[in-house]
């Protein structure tokens, strides 16, 4: 769910934010009426130093990055390799480092871990990893154990490497077929991809499905997130961009990047190195 704001200021006129109804509040943990969000677990978080879009030489390697509010990085368990031990969901929390929400798990042996929060999970639910786990939201197991047609997320590309695919807000992949030690998944992009049947995945869809409907409403909110302005190439000088310069406006050339590469329609995949694990590409 998301909420719109009354246009009492120019910045709130277009503003659309998540309602955060799924998140656990301090009041729920302490038995009070507080609506403040839960603080991250100290042993599972640390301050993340911002790179400002620079590489190890100090050169800009990613444009339009810099500034923003200092962030606590939450250590997420993407491997889900604590098998056979049940865990209780202690809280569902906001994470500034990703579009999805995260859930804090309290295992019965006392260990605590963060995972990506699946859609519909709430405080008090119980999840488990490993073979023989029930096919319910939040449980993790190998792809060969999951029945056809079920939606999964946080999918490994190689057994034991940790989830790499389908981790953004609202995404899920569907298990289509199983043949000769491989499982075919339909990815959110529409691509059909084969993976080793021993790769792990978590049952369910990623939380915060309305993330793509949010509107920041003002430039300042983008700056809080560490996103700097994007200057048009036509507004630059010829020394700075292929589109720069000229008397007045001129649009008689192919759109290019600042480094002269064609931006629209140029194929980048090498025909001789096609990925054999992609059964059907994402083109409709």
Curated annotation (Swiss-Prot):
<feature type="compositionally biased region" description="Basic residues">
    <location>
        <begin position="36"/>
        <end position="46"/>
    </location>
</feature>
<dbReference type="GO" id="GO:0015934">
    <property type="term" value="C:large ribosomal subunit"/>
</dbReference>
<dbReference type="InterPro" id="IPR002171">
    <property type="entry name" value="Ribosomal_uL2"/>
</dbReference>
<keyword id="KW-0687">Ribonucleoprotein</keyword>
<keyword id="KW-0699">rRNA-binding</keyword>
<dbReference type="GO" id="GO:0002181">
    <property type="term" value="P:cytoplasmic translation"/>
</dbReference>
<dbReference type="InterPro" id="IPR008991">
    <property type="entry name" value="Translation_prot_SH3-like_sf"/>
</dbReference>
<dbReference type="GO" id="GO:0003723">
    <property type="term" value="F:RNA binding"/>
</dbReference>
<dbReference type="InterPro" id="IPR014722">
    <property type="entry name" value="Rib_uL2_dom2"/>
</dbReference>
<dbReference type="Pfam" id="PF00181">
    <property type="entry name" value="Ribosomal_L2"/>
</dbReference>
<dbReference type="InterPro" id="IPR014726">
    <property type="entry name" value="Ribosomal_uL2_dom3"/>
</dbReference>
<keyword id="KW-0689">Ribosomal protein</keyword>
<comment type="similarity">
    <text>Belongs to the universal ribosomal protein uL2 family.</text>
</comment>
<dbReference type="InterPro" id="IPR022666">
    <property type="entry name" value="Ribosomal_uL2_RNA-bd_dom"/>
</dbReference>
<feature type="compositionally biased region" description="Basic and acidic residues">
    <location>
        <begin position="240"/>
        <end position="250"/>
    </location>
</feature>
<keyword id="KW-0694">RNA-binding</keyword>
<dbReference type="InterPro" id="IPR012340">
    <property type="entry name" value="NA-bd_OB-fold"/>
</dbReference>
<dbReference type="InterPro" id="IPR022669">
    <property type="entry name" value="Ribosomal_uL2_C"/>
</dbReference>
<dbReference type="InterPro" id="IPR022671">
    <property type="entry name" value="Ribosomal_uL2_CS"/>
</dbReference>
<dbReference type="Pfam" id="PF03947">
    <property type="entry name" value="Ribosomal_L2_C"/>
</dbReference>
<comment type="subunit">
    <text>Part of the 50S ribosomal subunit. Forms a bridge to the 30S subunit in the 70S ribosome.</text>
</comment>
<feature type="region of interest" description="Disordered">
    <location>
        <begin position="232"/>
        <end position="284"/>
    </location>
</feature>
<dbReference type="GO" id="GO:0003735">
    <property type="term" value="F:structural constituent of ribosome"/>
</dbReference>
<comment type="function">
    <text>One of the primary rRNA binding proteins. Required for association of the 30S and 50S subunits to form the 70S ribosome, for tRNA binding and peptide bond formation. It has been suggested to have peptidyltransferase activity; this is somewhat controversial. Makes several contacts with the 16S rRNA in the 70S ribosome.</text>
</comment>
<dbReference type="InterPro" id="IPR005880">
    <property type="entry name" value="Ribosomal_uL2_bac/org-type"/>
</dbReference>
<feature type="compositionally biased region" description="Basic residues">
    <location>
        <begin position="264"/>
        <end position="284"/>
    </location>
</feature>
<dbReference type="GO" id="GO:0019843">
    <property type="term" value="F:rRNA binding"/>
</dbReference>
<protein>
    <recommendedName>
        <fullName>Large ribosomal subunit protein uL2</fullName>
    </recommendedName>
</protein>
<dbReference type="GO" id="GO:0016740">
    <property type="term" value="F:transferase activity"/>
</dbReference>
<feature type="region of interest" description="Disordered">
    <location>
        <begin position="28"/>
        <end position="50"/>
    </location>
</feature>
